[in-house]
Amino acid sequence: RLAPRMPSATKGNKPLNLTEKELKKNYYTVASPWEEVSLKDKMPYLQKLNDRIFALDKRVHKVQASQSDTTSHIFFCNSEGVMFYDYRPMVTLGAVCIMEEDGKTENGYAARAYRRGFDFLSDEVVDVIAREAVDQTSLLFKAIKPKGGEMPVVMGAGGSGILLHEAIGHTFEADFNRKNVSIFADQLNKKVCNEHINVVDDGTIPFNRGSVNFDDEGAEGQKTYLIKDGVLTSYLHDRISAKHYGVEPTGNGRRESFRNMPIPRMRATYMEAGNVSESDIISSVKKGIFVDNFTNGQVQIGAGDFTFFVKSGYMIEDGKLTQ
């Protein structure tokens, strides 16, 4: 019922000439679509993941292996005559590993998620996830409860990205800044951190779960520097906020569904590597904490306050990782 009315749904009821937007680069080509894959095809990989984790450590008591996949068919057109179609796959393979030792129980989780098809599932991926889940769980049996207090925190690459995402990334989303909710609402083009820090939001990493060929308003996925050399250089924009600030959209417009208005949200947000090695950073700390992984975070973007639970990490003493 909607389609016949779309060509005349513009001001003055003038016919609308729809022009399909050219796909310059596909960041998630799919060789084996999930629509062509049966449950019978997927089950062996779950069984392999389950068996592999049990085989790696005799303390394993229980395994919860899971796999999910979705396919979104996005058809978009607007009153400016822009039209595009995007095929967006998503797959996640993960496992919870539960171990018991001397009456004590610990659990760990490992997973991988990409915009890939059935070809993503492989023995190599199963092995990586299994080893990571077992290693993470095994490490917790050696964990101690450190003394409380204020001390430096060194964040390891990868797992600590949740802190960057929650504590910093959301504060750069332009709707919060446009409404003066974010602590960074008046900090654009000002120095906000150390000059060696560069923070990026990237929607163009091949097969990354945050990547998009086009966002939900038709803007192309792109790489945006939020912080460059310590200076806040850009917010994450949808079309409304881009017009408000007099800039171009950054490819971050996202809708929960076609029933919802778009809002600017992150793609893949990360801090670029610097010139200082991890070992040099650790050796510079007299007493502190090195964090592998965070969990259970709470953030107040207006106040800039955040709290996270350290899932796994080490004490730093005299510039060395100890326990």
Residue spans for each PLM region:
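Active-site bordering "gate/hinge" segments
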Residues: R1-Q222, K228-V231, K320
